[in-house]
Amino acid sequence: MADSDVATKPIHIMGAGLSGLAAATILAKAGREVHVHDIRTDSGARFDGDFQALENWSMDADFFQQLNDWGFDASQFRATEFQVVDLIHPDDVITQPKSDRVAYRIVERGTAEHTIDQGMKRQAIAAGVSIHYKSRVKEEDCTIIACGPKGTSAVAYGEIFKTSHPNHIAFQLNDKLAPGAYSYLIIVDGVGLICTCLWRKQSKSERFLNETIAWYEKHYPNLDRAPIKRVGGKGDFTINQRYKQDGRCLLYTSPSPRDRQKSRMPSSA
């Protein structure tokens, strides 16, 4: 096939998550015809109001400035900035690492208008991307594979609640509450999430979440929690050496230290 034919051939992407939408937007802005396929009904549909962190300390450049340089508008979704975190040690001692700039931003995942999923979706559509939901395609018919995890190496289980407590973040390393992993507390604009992540003993997630909630209520007596619902998810962590396979590009999600990852991660993350 001639190079000119390849350059004009429509690009099909499997997965309308953040990676798939970002790739589609850039390609569409470059003049390519792009079709994104997803088996779900909407971008972010596999999330349920989950909070995730976008870390901002591993590079000199601010991540939102990088987004802007890449042609994305971060004002299209809600993001709450933090410069400090409660770091809870295994012996329950709490220290507070601080940064003189934005250390990380909390975003919400899901189908609500203010989520990062919907913000990226709007920008993809504005760039001319055609998104096909409830669409099943074969990997061999796609140029880019961005469909998230297939395996499970960890599970996360949490409880969302209403609270009058001010915005706050806590990250805990305690193997008795989160075997092999970590737990965390996030509060943003009156909504909180306490979550435990399990690399081991995953069948006992209910027990570990209950014990984790009890720990936070004991050590943060002003939480003033009014439970809304419990949410769960799975995660998979692999060190991949390849970004192309059988002529198709593989997209991965770079991890945040407290991100409830459900995506495969590359070795350069």
Q: Residues of each region from the PLM?
A:
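Extreme N-terminal leader/targeting segments of oxidoreductases
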Residues: 1-11
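N-terminal Rossmann-like FAD-binding beta1-loop-alpha1 element of flavoenzymes
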Residues: 11-35
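Glycine-rich FAD pyrophosphate-binding loop
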Residues: 29-48
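N-terminal FAD cofactor-binding segment of flavoenzymes
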Residues: 46-86
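Short beta-strand to alpha-helix junction loop
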Residues: 101-122, 203-204
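Predominantly flavin-linked oxidoreductase catalytic cores and closely associated redox partners
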Residues: 119, 123-221
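FAD-binding beta-loop-beta segment adjacent to the flavin cofactor pocket
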Residues: 234-251
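Conserved small/polar residues in nucleotide/adenosyl-binding loops
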Residues: 252-259
